[in-house]
Amino acid sequence: MLPLLLLPLLWGGSLQEKPVYELQVQKSVTVQEGLCVLVPCSFSYPWRSWYSSPPLYVYWFRDGEIPYYAEVVATNNPDRRVKPETQGRFRLLGDVQKKNCSLSIGDARMEDTGSYFFRVERGRDVKYSYQQNKLNLEVTALIEKPDIHFLEPLESGRPTRLSCSLPGSCEAGPPLTFSWTGNALSPLDPETTRSSELTLTPRPEDHGTNLTCQVKRQGAQVTTERTVQLNVSYAPQNLAISIFFRNGTGTALRILSNGMSVPIQEGQSLFLACTVDSNPPASLSWFREGKALNPSQTSMSGTLELPNIGAREGGEFTCRVQHPLGSQHLSFILSVQRSSSSCICVTEKQQGSWPLVLTLIRGALMGAGFLLTYGLTWIYYTRCGGPQQSRAERPG
């Protein structure tokens, strides 16, 4: 009697443990053409442990197809035919024994767009298609761009490794073909630019130029590319000083070497412009005879103003360049010369005393003339006795 009483309890326990047909999968999945996507999936089905253990087979089918006759898009059953167009691209991932039906779709194609359903088979008792939970796949045009990776900033003369990758791509399907283009790559072997990685030794002239990585999937008309602008750090170069006259029409002189002497007329006004090519921009400062000039005289752009230069304002002028990758300086001698009119000109104070000097000279000359006339007259009368003495000495 006891076994008969326990039988309903055992049946009740078995019924409670009996699973049902359930499928958990995304209803809608979108992937770009040429890329891949992983669709997580899990399932359950009724199965009793005292049954025999035939192999468990799972299948993914195109919607609308008859499971008994149609080719599958993915399965773990080696005896079932797989559609040629999905062979190797649609794959089951995970352990189906652990109820994992995840589907990997690689190298997605436009014709893959559509609905798919999952089916499970085990022996004669389990043959079920989960038609109530279908996967809707949409393949859109490729808009994803490659990623270009490298350590910034690039430094002139220092080799740097660059890599290009396409987000969303996977190993399934034909391999990717990479190609690099850009002015900075001209000295490289053309075969090097066919790899996803390359080593670049940038030059100063490469700063601001474009570098492009193009990715194409072999056998498919799917191409995408990304272009980046190179930021190359380089030490100061082409240091020069240009001299401008305030009332001039252009550059009066361009100094490219140290120690050059530049003559200039006293009273002229100049602008001195110090220029240098570097990245990042260098810090410029002006010195006269080794001493830093007042910041109010200079500007951030390296321009120095010298208004109405005096005779004592010449000397050695130096432009110094400070940069993380190196420093430079350039000097010249400013020789101030008196103008030709300064030899015959006097100051305003001196010009005011000229009338008095002329008056004194004029008075002195008049006095000297008077004294000379008086002296000659006195000598004449003294020696000759005058007119009366001359008449007395005449004979009767």
From Swiss-Prot:
Q: Name one GO molecular function term.
A: carbohydrate binding
Annotated compartments: Cell membrane
Keyword Transcription assigned: no
Which of this chain's residues carry glycans?
A: 231
The signal sequence is 1-16
Tissues expressing the protein: Mainly expressed in hematopoietic tissues including bone marrow, spleen and fetal liver. Also detected in lung and testis.
Q: What is the effect of changing residue 362 to A?
A: Loss of interaction with TYROBP
Share what the entry says about its subunit structure, partners included. Interacts with TYROBP.
Give the protein's recorded name.
Sialic acid-binding Ig-like lectin 14
